[in-house]
Amino acid sequence: MLVKTYSAAVNGLQVTTVTVEVSLIKGVMYHLTGLGDVAVREGRDRIAAAMQYNGMKFPRADITVNMAPADLKKEGSGFDLPLAIAILAADGQIPADSLGEYMMIGELGLDGKLQPAKGVLPIAIKARAEHFKGLIVPKHNEREAAIVNNIDVYGMDSLADVIALLSRQREYQPCVVDTRDEFYKQQYDFDLDFSDVRGQETVKRALEVAAAGGHNVIMIGPPGSGKSMMAKRLPSILPPLTLRESLETTQIHSVAGTLKQGSALISQRPFRAPHHTISEVALVGGGMNPMPGEISLSHNGVLFCDELPEFNKHTLEVLRQPLEDRQITISRAKYSVTYPASFMFVASMNPCPCGYYGDPTHHCVCTPGQIQRYLNKISGPLMDRIDIQCEISAIPFKELSKAQPGEPSANIRERVIAARAIQTRRYEGVAGVHCNAQMTEKMIHKYAEPDAAGLELLRTAMERLSLSARAYSRILKVARTIADLDGAEKVEPRHIAEAIGYRQLDRGDWAERGL
C-alpha cells in the first residue's frame, strides 16, 4: 500500500513542501530515498521505539520511503512525525483518508513525545499558502504557528495524540491566538527606561537623534560612564514594530529556534549584545545548515557591540556588507541562503587600552602609539558606516547624587515617532529607503542641502577641525534628522552645528588631545 503525508523543508526563510511517500511490500528491509541527512536516516530507530512504547507495532515488511522533491536535501529530525504516520497508515494501523488535509512536523522522542521544532512559523505560512486544512506541530510551537490565520493549528504532546486526532478517536480544538492582542499587549512594556539614567544629557540627545533617523552610533568613554546602560535602553525609545516587521522578525527567530515556549509574535524590537569573543559564523550566520547569526537576530532592532576594539578585526570587517545591504547571503556549494539584517548598529569603546585617556580623575598609562594602535583596530570603512560618534565622560559622585531622574523613555519616544512619521511620508514609494540613515547621495542633495549660511558653517568646521571627507554626507544626514525632530522643513545652521558635534573621531587631532 502506498501512503502519502506532507511536511516541509526550511532553507533560510524559504519553505518547500515535502511529500513523504511510504510503500510496504513483503520483506524486511528499510529503504530511504530523497536526500535525507543523518538525522532523517536515524529517524527509523526513534520511530520504532516510539511506536513500541505507545503500544503499536513497527511493520515487519520491506519499507520504502521517498521524500519528494528528491533533489532537495532534507535536514533535521522534524520529519519523524510525518514518516511515522505514513508507516502506520501504510500498515493499516490508522486510517489514511484524512492525511492529505494536514501538514505535519515534529521530532519523536523514544517515548513518543513530540520535541520542539525550528522554523514552525514559516512552515505555517507555507501550509496556508498550499491550502492545507490543518497543521500539526509540537505543543511547544502551537502559539507560534497559530498567529497565521485561516489554517487550523493543532499542538500535540505525543505521537498517540496525533493518532487520536487523525483517527477521530478524540476531539481536539485548534489553537487560537488573537494576533493583534498578542502584538499590542507587550509593545510598550519595557523593563529598562531612560529615566534611570541621571545626567549624560548630551549622550541621551545623541541617542535620540540616532533613534529618530535610524543612524548607527558609537560611544567613546571611560569605564563606568554609562555607555552600556544607555545602549540597553535604546529599544525603549525606538518606534514600535509594525505588524509586518513583527511577523518578519518572529520568522527569523523561529528558524533560529530562539522563541520562548508559549510565545507567539515578537512585539518589541530585538536587542542583541554578543560577547567580543564571538566567531564570524555566530555573528553573520552559517553552519552546514545555514542558520541566522546575531546580525539577523537583530533585524528590525539593535545590535550592540560593547568594547568594539576587543572584537576580532576580521569578524568586525564582515559587518561592512550587511550594514550597507541590510541583508546577508550565506553561500554553499549547491545553494545559498539570504537572511534580512536591517538593524541599528550601536557600539561602545574605551578611548585607549587602559580606558582612562583624557579622564580628569584617573591617570592614563598608555603611550600615544598604543592609543593609535588601539583606535586602528576599527577600520576606516567600518567607521564610515557609523553616522554618530559621541564622547561620554564619567559623572563624579557629587554631581550624580544631585542629578534629577532622567526624562522618561515614553516622552523621548513620542518625539522619535513624530520624526519617523515625517520620514515615512518623505520616502513613500522609494524602495529600500525608510529613514534618513538610508538616504542616497542624490537624496541628500534633495532633502538635506543646507542654505548658504549652513554651507559656510560646514566648510569652516571641516577646515578647522580637520574633518575627513567622508564626514560630509554623514553630517548632512544627521542634520536632516535633527531638523525632523524640530519639525523644520529645511536644514538650518543650528542643525548643522549639532550634527558636526557628533563627528568626534573624524577630527584629525582626536588621538592627540584629551577627551
Label each region the model flagged.
Residues M1-I218, P222-S225, S331, A471-Y472, ...:
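Peripheral, non-AAA+ core regions of ATP-driven protein-machinery
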Residues N300, D306-E307, V318:
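Walker B catalytic acidic pair
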Residues M219-K260, D325:
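Walker A/P-loop
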Residues T33-R44, P59, N66-G76, P290, ...:
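Basic, amphipathic alpha-helical bundle interface domains used for macromolecular binding and assembly
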Residues V18-L24, L283, D387-C390:
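Short beta-strand elements
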Residues G221, G285, E307:
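The Walker A (P-loop) glycine that initiates the GxxxxGKT/S ATP-binding motif of P-loop NTPases
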Residues R170-V209, G213, P240-I295:
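P-loop NTPase nucleotide-binding/switch module
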